[in-house]
Amino acid sequence: MAAKLKKGDKVVVLTGKDKGKQGEISAVFPKENKAVVDGINIAIRHQRQTQTSQGGRVAKAMPIDLSNLALLDKNGKATRVGFREEDGKKVRFAKTTGDVI
């Protein structure tokens, strides 16, 4: 099955501590059904000092389940994603507006 959400998509968080926040997907893990969104689901990780990097507490965006994310359409509203064929190619489209993503 094709991915409904891809790297670079603008999304909004539907549930959890970051509900309502918006961000851009920076990485997708299809096997785990998760994605990393910039500025969302931030956790503090303790990093050991090395010769190249300084140690300490580092804020890191952790993966969030794809079911907790919704794509933002051109109007800035959350939408579901559908697939259809146009000119022999499978394309994604926003179900609220019908526009190709």
Swiss-Prot record:
Gene that specifies this protein: rplX
GO BP annotations, alphabetical order: translation
SMART domains found in the cross-reference section: KOW (SM00739)
The protein, known as: Large ribosomal subunit protein uL24
Keyword DNA damage found: no
Cysteines paired by S-S bonds: none
Keyword RNA-binding: yes
Keyword set, alphabetical order: Ribonucleoprotein, Ribosomal protein, RNA-binding, rRNA-binding
GO cellular component: ribonucleoprotein complex; ribosome
A GO MF term: structural constituent of ribosome
NCBIfam families assigned: rplX_bact (TIGR01079)
A Pfam family that the UniProt record links to this protein: KOW
